[in-house]
């Protein structure tokens, strides 16, 4: 059985292939997650609709329709190439969708665009030495001290914490 996406998607695949070929020389190996080169690359991917496709423009996304086939084509063509992939992580994959669905307008404006661009890197830290993933037994506490939060406790397995 041979499955085809259709002419519209063939055109889109050709566009993605062209972009990939034009950008084969981009190399971010050894660059910090916070480097301006990474932020610029991330923005270029957004501008072309190869990242944050369905996130509204007003929040820093491409503003396109959700289209699983286009998303699949992007993933396939990027996987065949050595060009840098878009940033991912907790902020982009977990926080941004939550803010878009449940956040206040102020939170969306403050955090979504800089997170998508890679200007803000997030981590999650809920595992503790005596708790594992049992969230009911967590001991870390945060207390408001004037205008700042003071957090006391210990976390383990904090992905991307050194960049957050």
Regions found by a protein language model. Give the residues of each.
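Amphipathic, small/basic residue-rich leader segments at the start of a protein or domain
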Residues: 1-89, 106-117, 121
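Short hydrophobic "helix-edge" motifs at membrane interfaces and signal-peptide entry regions
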Residues: 46-47, 94-95, 143-144
């Amino acid at each position: 059985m041979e499955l085809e996406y259709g002419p519209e998607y063939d055109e889109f695949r050709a566009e993605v292939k062209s972009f990939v070929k034009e950008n084969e020389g981009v190399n971010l190996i050894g660059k910090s997650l916070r480097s301006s080169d990474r932020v610029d690359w991330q923005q270029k991917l957004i501008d072309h609709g190869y990242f944050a496709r369905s996130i509204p423009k007003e929040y820093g996304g491409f503003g396109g329709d959700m289209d699983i086939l286009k998303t699949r084509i992007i993933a396939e063509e990027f996987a065949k190439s050595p060009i840098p992939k878009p940033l991912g992580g907790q902020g982009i994959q977990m926080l941004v969708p939550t803010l878009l669905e449940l956040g206040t307008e102020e939170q969306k404006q403050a955090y979504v665009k800089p997170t998508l661009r890679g200007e803000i890197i997030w981590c999650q830290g809920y595992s503790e030495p005596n708790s594992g993933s049992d969230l009911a037994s967590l001991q870390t506490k945060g207390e408001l001290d004037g205008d700042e939060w003071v957090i006391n406790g210990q976390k383990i397995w904090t992905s991307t914490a050194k960049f957050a």
